[in-house]
Amino acid sequence: DIDVIGDGELDIMNDAEIPAIIYDVFSAMGLKRFQIRINNRRVLNGFYSMLGLTEQSGEIMRTVDKIEKIGPDMVRAILVDDVKLTDEQADEILKFIAITGTNEEVLAALKGYCGRDELFDRGYEELSTVIKYLGGFGVAQENFKVDLTIARGLDYYTGTVYETALLDYPQIGSVCSGGRYDNLAEYYTDRKLPGVGISIGVTRLFYVLGEQGLLNDALNTAPADVLLLPMTEDLSFAVSLATRLRERGLRAQLY
């Protein structure tokens, strides 16, 4: 897991740095055909508000989040039969999340909805800023995409959301997902601690690395050059020795 937690506030720049780190990590491992798909839940909630569906927004997002697994027809059926939307509302939602094109084209289409809902406008500004910063972090254009189908089914996400796909392995689903959570810490403390983070599905990732022959010596490096096995309860000598080894550039670990 990778998380950044703010004290009181957390700049939107961090929402871009998280996927930039994933880009650097995946690239360093030799992966090339991957895509970080990005959306913003404020955009989705704001759009549902325009349709008069604020109270149903959670159910709608959890349903839309399944679209890659069950397809748009089944999503529409659930929205109408279970969530109790009208045919017109369901069609409007499917039309909205089907907006596609280059990042610039999708953002231009979203801009046409601005001015009708404050939450949507805020989400649009956040999403636009994240996309701009990703370019500044050096993330290649082909490796990130605005994707309005990305919702993340967990309700604690409040803004930016991500899923990462390995394009040659669509059957394994997302290998890296996460997003912005402004209010999650309120269950544990009175302090406002907004955060943004992402988790890597290690099992899925290592399967692909193995398939592509990328589990080389560089990725199998031992965690230490020297493993110290103290034979007494007094660790003073072992700690001192480990310190001297580290001062000489060796990675020493106490067992």
What does each model-identified segment do?
Residues 36-39, 67-73, 122:
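Short acidic alpha-helix initiation/capping motifs at coil-to-helix transition points
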Residues 37, 60-62, 252-255:
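A generic structural motif
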Residues 36, 40-47, 52:
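Glycine-rich, mobile lid/loop segments that gate access to catalytic sites or pores
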Residues 1-32, 42, 76-255:
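Positively charged, Gly/Ser-enriched RNA/tRNA-binding surfaces
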Residues 52-80, 166-168:
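Acidic, His- and aromatic-enriched active-site or binding-groove loops in soluble protein domains
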